[in-house]
Amino acid sequence: MSTRHLVSICALIASTTLAAPVGAQGAPNVPKLQFEKITLPNGLEVILHEDHSTPIVVANTWYHVGSGDEKPGRTGFAHLFEHIMFMGSENVPTGQFDKLLEAAGADNNGSTTTDRTNYYEQLPSNALPLALWLDADRMGRLLPVMDQAKLDLQRDVVKNERRQRYDNVPYGRANETIVAALFPATHPYHWTTIGSMTDLSAASLEDVKEFFRTYYAPNNATLVIAGDFNRDSVVTWVNRYFGGIPRGPQMPARPVVPAFTVARDTFLVQEDKVTLPRLYKTWHSVKLFHPDDAALDVLADVLAGDKNSRLYKRLVFDMQVAQDVNAFQNSGMLDGYFQITVTPKPGQTPAKMAALVAEELEKIQRDGPTPRELARSLNTRRASFLDQLASVLGKADRLASYDYMAGTPDYAQQDLARYERVTAADVQRVANTYLKQHAVVLTVVPEGKRQLMVTGGAK
């Protein structure tokens, strides 16, 4: 809340509005997902959600391991296994995993974050037994056929991915530079999911196998089956294919995040093969589901969530000095950060962008957001929730995510309720609490243009 005296009726009304929750006028309107949760004797969590609207089913397996579980000197393993898991297993020859699914009309993929690795198949209902058998075989029978040739092949694939998505993409190395500067060397988010190519090159076959034995076990996984299926048949298949996989060792505790503060503003410059410079300002913030997490999301919406947001409207539309602007709260299970990025138009400088961003931050820190801005943010959040729950794959992903990260699959309504409870005072408070801290300020510049580096105005 502002500390200014309330010297008039208008000010009193304003302060009352500032304290009013965004969603005070209605309850969250997210549909409740019906599900059944079963835990096998080997520890595998199985979540079933029936949806018979279309003859489609999704099998979505989440392993509770991400790049944040790696150790310094052993980075990139979680993402490497995302690739290795498609190579084949004891009963599935090399190259046949995708071919079998393609023949069944399936769409399948995997992804890795700081906190988890997932694999999914979306396919016709009558092909579900195939997907479950394939997933079980790679969970329980991958190591016997894991050899040096497969490791070398997938290591090269990952290195090529790094070249394509990081090293040779405009601004592709920015995030790696930022997190390395923001988080201490012992912090599990100090590196990105792609990992260090030096670490991957040095990894032995036994190193990689040990990582699999530690984390790719049924007692460290959640399997969500969503869509058009018969419950009794699915339970039979799950027990048949997964029930015999031995329980793995006791899972290591999630890494302990070292307590730290960003002691000073850090100004960095990175030359890249880009036409326009780009400014990144990043503050240490909070982890997922922290009491301030939702308010920081709303703050990001107000600043640069859409074309009506403050920074976008002023810099892109009104002044026409920026190509684009973005803001977001990045919330991991262990920690988080808040970031604003601005790409100036030709002839404009990153330093000017930094000054304009600072002006807008001062305004919201002083006055907070308007009721209209809060309502717009909440409407966007509601629409996003409903959109994600409109598909079977979206439902499966939400159920797995909530089960692991919130402790229960039944969390969609509570999740949206966090945003319903955010007040203007909350947004103003988090803007002052986190965006007045020291920041990491990175300027990505065209090659030979280091003079464009921002060297002040981090707050």
Where are these regions (language model features)?
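M16 family metallopeptidases and their MPP-like homologs
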Residues: H49, T54-P72, G76-L80, T94-R141, ...
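Active-site His/Glu-centered metal-binding helix of metallohydrolases
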Residues: F77-M85, L299
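Short, glycine/charge-rich beta-strand/loop segments that flank catalytic centers
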Residues: T114-Y120, Q148-N160
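Non-catalytic, conformational "gating/processing" segments within enzyme and secreted inhibitor domains
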Residues: Q148, R155, K209-Y241, A439
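His/Glu-based metal-binding/catalytic segments typifying zinc-dependent metallopeptidases
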Residues: R163-N168, V179-A180, Q250-N308
